[in-house]
Every structure is written in structure tokens, then in C-alpha cells.
Amino acid sequence: MTITPPHRAAAVRHKARLPAAVLSASVAMLMAAAAHAEVVPSQFSSAALEKAPETVSCTLENGTQTQCTRLVVKYKPDGLKTGPFCPPSLDDEGGIWDWDGENSGLYRLDRAFFEMLDTLGFHFHDDDESLHIMTDLSKRPVEANNCLNVAEDESVEMTVLLPLEPVEADEPTPLGTVAKIGLALDGVPIFADAPSVLDTGNLPALDTCGGHVDPGGWYHWHATATDIDTLYDEHGVDAHCQLPQSHTAQFAYAFDGYPMFGTQDSGGSVPTDLDSCNGHFGPTERHPEGEYHYHATDEFPNLPKCLKGVVAKDNFVTTASMGIGSPRIPGQGPGPGGPEKDTSDRPESDQPSEAPSQASSEQ
């Protein structure tokens, strides 16, 4: 029988306990760090705010009573330059569009793009090469295919609720067409994919920063605008956003309260451990010890694909007469123009409907 000396036995026992101790400490540190995730109202630009942010009681979608920051933002931040959107003619250059039909990809709105759509059965221009442009979506369209360039309404205000401390959901919430994603630090709301031309027949043109005007008259993003040039470089698109670009800077807070960043982490590396929502736990400038946050990617739209946390009820309300967040959201009919499509195999939730829907507000 081999007898282990007492000092070696103690060392063996200590070594056996070490992994559990390290694991426990790691879990404790992770939980402590996660608790640091919070919305900081002072980060939002005063150029977008109608009044100072307020802390209010709110109810999350899962019934949790908590505290939210309430921000009342303008139709567009003071001094923000937007456009171009729809080009007046084929000789002009407009914004961008992520085409999801045949020859799919990210395109500049120019002659080559619209002539390509012509070959696919979508006709956005007349014989004189002027585009069909709609600026008022309350009116019935004359043409089957139109480029949407909605007029701004300076009177519109938007009220946004963000949980001050994020609460992780039991399951991530998928983000469909025109789903509410968050509020950029410049005060511009952020939404998921704009409605497809394949569904509506119309093209809601985006400018080169990935934004456009809602039917209600207010400007919003469909991309991480402060890192969108990464997309152009990746996909070979000749475009540039006039906003300062940064791979690492915080762009926004999602509606669940978690922060949103560019394509790289605080150390300048592209994260390799992103989850299905394009998020992960890792260090940020405000929390070097780590917090959960989302990252932009090199695919359009470079936004979260789902939300990890729980959002507040009534988290986006506008004073607009139509569009998202207003009492009136017009219905979406079958997409006019283009070749006939067989939608019999599409899930019922994807079928065009006459019922009001968020997606319909940007036909």
C-alpha cells in the first residue's frame, strides 16, 4: 500500500477543489458584470430631444414592473443631413437598396440597378427615364412600381421607453419586417428590414446611411449607420455615409436596454462568438469587465437579428397621423408589378394581407 505524505495529500485535495472554486468565482464575476448593463440617458444627443429624459415606472412585455427612461425625440435630430433617396431619373444617383429577388444583393440606386429590375418585370421609370416617385403614401399609387421618398413632417414627436436595467427573456424575440429594434444615440429610431419590393411592388429607398422617412413623416434607420461603410467595402458598393464611421463605437440601445456596437469589440477585433441575435458577453468601453451587447455584422441589414431581452409595453408612440407608432397603420395588399409569384408554399404569416401590419406602413 502506498502512503501519500500529508503535505502532498493536502496539495492534491487543494488541486481537486481548484476548478470548482475557479468556476464559482467566474460565475459570480459574470453575474456581477451582467448587472452593470444599464441604459445611460445622458448618452443620447440633446439635438434630438424635445425635453430632458425622464425616469418613469413601466411594465415589460412579460409583466415585470420596473423603471424605464422615457425619451421624447424629434422627427429628425437638429442638423442631421439625410438623402439622397430616389434618383429623379436614370441619369441620377440615389441611395441604396438591399434587393432580395433574382440577382440579390446590396445596390446603389442608379441606372444599372433600375435597368436590371426592368429585365425582371419591375418597371420603376417612364420612357423618358424619369422615375415614378411617391412622396405622399396616403394617396393611391398611379403606377404599379414606385420609388418611395416620403416628405418629412417637422411637427411629429416620438416617445420611446427603454428599460433602465435589461431583463433577459426566456427566449429571444425574432425581428421581422419593420420590427422595432432600438434608438440610436443620435436620437434616430432603428427598425429591421424595410418591406420587400417583392411583396409590395414599391421600393422605400434608403439613403447611404441606411435611413429614410416613415409614412408618418419621421426619419429612422434600417442599418447601423455609424459602421455602414464596412458593408460597402465588403460588398463592393460605391457609397459612403456622411456620419463619422467607427467599428468599435456604441451606436444605440436596443429596445430591450442592451447596447449596440459596430463590427468590432473594444479591442479592435471582430467577435467570433456572437449568438443568434448577433450579441455576446464581453468587455466594452464603459464596462471593461464585460456586459451583454450586440454587434453590427458585414451583412445588410447590419443589425441584431433578434432581441435577447424583454421590451417595455407601448415603447414607441408617435404623434404622426399614420405609420408605425400611430393609431393608423394602413393595410398591405399583394405586391403590384413584377412577374406573378407562386406564394402557395409560403407560411401563412408571410402571405400578403389586407389586415393592418407594421410592414404595411412603408409600402
Regions found by a protein language model. Give the residues of each.
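Bacterial N-terminal signal peptides
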Residues: 21-31
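Sec/Tat signal peptide C-region and signal peptidase I cleavage site
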Residues: 31-37
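Short, low-complexity cationic-aromatic patches
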Residues: 153, 183, 206-217, 275-291
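N-terminal secretory signal peptides that target proteins for export/translocation
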Residues: 1-16
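Extracellular/lumenal glycan-associated surfaces
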Residues: 156-162, 184-186, 214-229, 287-301
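Long, compositionally biased interface segments
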Residues: 38-40, 44-46, 271-363
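Solvent-exposed N-terminal domain segments of exported/luminal and surface proteins
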Residues: 38-199
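Short helix-loop boundary/capping segments
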Residues: 198-206, 216-270
